[in-house]
Amino acid sequence: MKTFAIYAATALAEIAGCFAFWAWLKLDKSVWWLVPGMAALALFAWLLTLIESEGAGRVYAAYGGVYIAASLLWLWVAEGKQPDHWDISGAMVCLVGTVMIIAGPR
């Protein structure tokens, strides 16, 4: 459960940081959006180091599924665009992969 909470916080930090750049470049927001965006991206990188694993690549691979699902949640909550059934199905496949990577016997 702790691992999932860290992955969820990591996804929020990364998506918020990337959205700050999106807002600046695509939505004509102030360049000052980059200040919290950069802080969020630094937090994202730090949070990934808190995951217990013998390899960074495995952490990043497992995180990928969480990121995909969290991005679709962001699309819905922050941007007001509801994911379609293809989005949801794709995210579920990725989350199955995440569980296999995290819980697989080593």
Swiss-Prot record:
Keyword terms of this UniProt record: Cell inner membrane, Cell membrane, Membrane, Transmembrane, Transmembrane helix
Pfam families (alphabetical): UPF0060
SUPFAM superfamilies: Multidrug resistance efflux transporter EmrE (SSF103481)
Taxonomic superkingdom: Bacteria
InterPro entries with a match to the protein in the record: UPF0060 (IPR003844)
Gene Ontology cellular-component terms listed: plasma membrane
Compartment(s): Cell inner membrane
Lipid bilayer topology: Multi-pass membrane protein
Transmembrane segments: 4-24, 31-51, 59-79, 85-105
HAMAP family: UPF0060
Similarity comment: family membership: Belongs to the UPF0060 family.
Designated name of the protein: UPF0060 membrane protein Plav_2230
Species assigned in the record: Parvibaculum lavamentivorans (strain DS-1 / DSM 13023 / NCIMB 13966)
